[in-house]
């Protein structure tokens, strides 16, 4: 585990794209924002991620428990692929516009289940039972659009992180 910061506001565990892929996603989001005439602010490349678990604005003991659970996880690296965009339902005027896909996402779901079991052993409750639709949020907009195919974007998930890189754990079998 590698610690990079100390803030615990809005903690979550996530898979993140590499820097080149994040920049590609950001550029795609900018083009789609123009094409769909969205008004929202695009998520910056260093904040793009696939959320695995949201932990809330947690105090340090919760962060420590999450770190202990994450350190127990063993899983090989895998590829994810996103090939379409869509708007999710959200609060009026604040609808998430996201990347969706299928390829590799079963392995991501498996990683999430494994992490959920480890977190349950540390005292977290019911995390793995919640619905999970793997996605990358590009921006939040006032209106929504239907599903739209895109040139596939893929990357190899080599690690998962706590909040925007508070801590990280490499994937290894």
Per-region residue spans from a language model:
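Histidine-dependent nucleotide/RNA phosphoesterase domain, centered on the 2H-phosphoesterase fold
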Residues: 1-173
């Amino acid at each position: 585990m590698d610690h990079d910061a100390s803030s615990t506001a809005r903690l979550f565990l996530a898979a993140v794209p590499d820097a080149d892929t994040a920049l590609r996603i950001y550029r795609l989001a900018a083009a789609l924002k123009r094409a769909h005439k969205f008004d929202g602010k695009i998520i910056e490349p260093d904040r793009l991620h696939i959320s695995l678990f949201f932990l809330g604005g947690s105090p340090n003991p919760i962060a420590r428990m999450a770190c202990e659970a994450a350190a127990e996880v063993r899983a090989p690296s895998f590829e994810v692929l996103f090939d379409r965009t869509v708007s999710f339902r959200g609060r009026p005027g604040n609808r998430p516009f996201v990347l969706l896909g299928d390829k590799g996402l079963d392995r991501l779901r498996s990683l999430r289940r494994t992490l959920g079991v480890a977190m349950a052993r540390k005292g977290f409750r019911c995390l793995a039972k919640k619905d999970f639709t793997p996605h990358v949020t590009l921006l939040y907009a006032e209106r929504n659009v239907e599903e739209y195919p895109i040139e596939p974007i893929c990357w190899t998930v080599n690690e998962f992180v706590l909040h925007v890189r508070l801590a990280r754990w490499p994937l290894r079998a």
